[in-house]
Curated annotation (Swiss-Prot):
Protein name: Heat-inducible transcription repressor HrcA
Physiological role: Negative regulator of class I heat shock genes (grpE-dnaK-dnaJ and groELS operons). Prevents heat-shock induction of these operons.
UniProt cross-references to Gene3D superfamilies, sorted A to Z: 3.30.450.40, Heat-inducible transcription repressor hrca homolog, domain 3, Winged helix-like DNA-binding domain superfamily/Winged helix DNA-binding domain
Pfam families xref list: HrcA (PF01628), HrcA_DNA-bdg (PF03444)
Organism: Paraburkholderia phymatum (strain DSM 17167 / CIP 108236 / LMG 21445 / STM815) (Burkholderia phymatum)
UniProt-listed InterPro entries: GAF-like_dom_sf, HrcA, HrcA_C, WH-like_DNA-bd_sf, WH_DNA-bd_sf, WHTH_HrcA_DNA-bd, WHTH_transcript_rep_HrcA_IDD
GO MF entry, a single one: DNA binding
SUPFAM superfamilies (alphabetical): GAF domain-like (SSF55781), Winged helix' DNA-binding domain (SSF46785)
GO biological process per UniProt: negative regulation of DNA-templated transcription
Keywords on record: Repressor, Stress response, Transcription, Transcription regulation
Record-stated family: Belongs to the HrcA family.
C-alpha cells in the first residue's frame, strides 16, 4: 500500500500525463498536487514509485510516465467518476441513436455511438442468436415451395425457403404453424426434433412431413455464433500513442482484422457485472501494451447477452470513457428489452 503522499503524487502524475501526454516532472507535481513538498522530496517519492514499477523515466526526459501497473492501481483505487453535464449529453446522444428496431441494427448503432462519443473505436460482441424460437409461420410460395418465417425471443426475424415433396394448401400451413407455436414455442429445434419422434404416431403424416422440413431448414438459421462489430477503428490513427510506431499500428489492425483476442476479452467481461477496464501490458487479454479496453455487459430482459466497449490508448481519460460505456450498455439493454 502507498502512503497518502505517494498516492496523491501518483494520481496527480497520471492525471497530468493523460491530459498533456508529456512526462511529468517535479515542478508540475508541486503545482498540481496541492502538497507543499520540496522538489527533492518529490523526486525521492518518484524514485520509490519507480522501484515499485508504477512509473518509469523515459530516456529523453527527466519527468516520468505511468506504467501499466501504475494505470491499474490508478483505475482501481484512485479514479473518481462523478456525474457531470457531459454525462447528461452522453445520455441524450445515446437515447437519440438507439431507437427500437431490428436488434442487429440497434447493436450496430451502439458500436457507432460508442466511437463517436469517445473518439476512439467502439466494439460490441453481438449476442449469440437463440437456438429457440418464439413463433414460426409458413407461407406458400408455389408448388412444393414454402417460405418459413422464424421469430426468435430476441425479436430477430429469419427466413428460409423450404422445398417439400408435396404441395400444401394455405389452410394446412396455418394449421401446422398453429400446432407448432402452441406445442413447441420456446424450445430449440433439436428439442422439437426429439419431441416429434416421440409424438409421431399422434400426428397426421402431412403434418409430420411439414414439421420435419421446418426443423431441417431452420438448423443453420438459428445456430449462428457470436460476432464482434467494430466501429471507428480509423479514429485510432489519430492517436499518437498507438499510431506513431508502424509495427504497433500493424499489430493493432491485425487485432481488428482477426478479432480472436477481442472475442476472448469481450467474452470474459460478459461474465462480470458492471464496467471492466483491461489495460495493455497488465492484462494478458489485451494484445498491445499501449492499448486499453473499457467494457460493460448488456442485457435482454435481465439476461446478459453480450458485451460492448471502447478501445483506445492506455493514456485515455477513463473518467470520461467509463460513463460513455456504462450509459450505452444500460440504454442498449433497455432498448433491446422493449422489442
Amino acid at each position: 500500500m502507498l502512503d497518502p503522499r505517494a498516492q496523491t503524487l501518483l494520481k496527480t502524475l497520471i492525471e497530468r500525463y493523460i491530459a498533456e501526454g508529456q512526462p511529468v516532472g517535479s515542478r508540475t507535481l508541486s503545482r498540481y498536487s496541492g502538497l507543499e513538498l520540496s522538489p527533492a522530496t518529490i523526486r525521492n517519492v518518484m524514485s520509490d514509485l519507480e522501484e515499485l514499477g508504477l512509473v518509469i523515466s523515459p530516456h529523453t526526459s527527466a519527468g516520468r510516465i505511468p506504467t501499466p501497473r501504475g494505470y491499474r492501481l490508478f483505475v482501481d483505487t484512485m479514479l473518481t467518476v462523478e456525474p457531470s453535464a457531459d454525462e447528461d449529453a452522453v445520455m441524450r446522444a445515446v437515447k437519440t441513436t438507439l431507437q427500437p428496431g431490428e436488434p442487429q441494427k440497434v447493436v450496430a448503432a451502439a458500436a457507432s455511438v460508442l466511437s463517436n462519443l469517445s473518439q476512439f473505436a467502439g466494439v460490441i460482441l453481438t449476442p449469440r442468436r437463440s437456438h429457440v424460437f418464439k413463433q414460426i409461420e409458413f407461407l406458400r410460395l408455389s408448388d412444393k415451395r414454402i417460405l418459413l418465417i422464424i421469430v426468435t425471443p430476441e425479436g430477430d426475424v429469419q427466413n428460409r425457403i423450404m422445398a417439400t415433396q408435396r404441395d400444401f394448401t394455405p389452410s394446412q400451413l396455418v394449421e401446422a404453424s398453429n400446432y407448432i407455436n402452441a406445442h413447441f414455442a420456446g424450445l430449440s429445434f433439436d428439442e422439437v426434433r426429439r419431441r416429434l419422434r416421440e409424438e409421431i404416431d399422434e400426428l397426421r403424416g402431412d403434418m409430420t412431413t411439414l414439421m420435419h422440413a421446418a426443423v431441417t431448414a431452420s438448423t443453420d438459421v438459428t445456430d449462428t455464433g457470436e460476432t464482434v462489430l467494430i466501429s471507428g477503428e480509423r479514429k485510432l490513427l489519430e492517436v499518437a500513442d498507438l499510431s506513431s510506431d508502424m509495427a504497433r499500428l500493424r499489430k493493432l489492425f491485425d487485432v481488428f482484422d482477426q478479432k480472436t483476442s477481442l472475442l476472448q476479452l469481450l467474452d470474459v467481461s460478459s461474465h462480470a457485472q458492471g464496467v471492466q477496464i483491461f489495460i495493455g501490458g497488465e492484462s494478458n487479454l489485451v494484445p498491445i501494451e499501449e492499448m486499453s479496453v473499457v467494457t460493460a455487459p448488456y442485457e435482454v430482459n435481465g439476461k446478459i447477452v453480450g458485451t460492448l466497449g471502447v478501445i483506445g490508448p492506455t493514456r485515455m481519460a477513463y473518467n470520461r470513457v467509463i460513463p460513455i460505456v456504462d450509459i450505452t450498455a444500460r440504454l442498449l439493454s433497455m432498448t433491446l428489452s422493449q422489442q
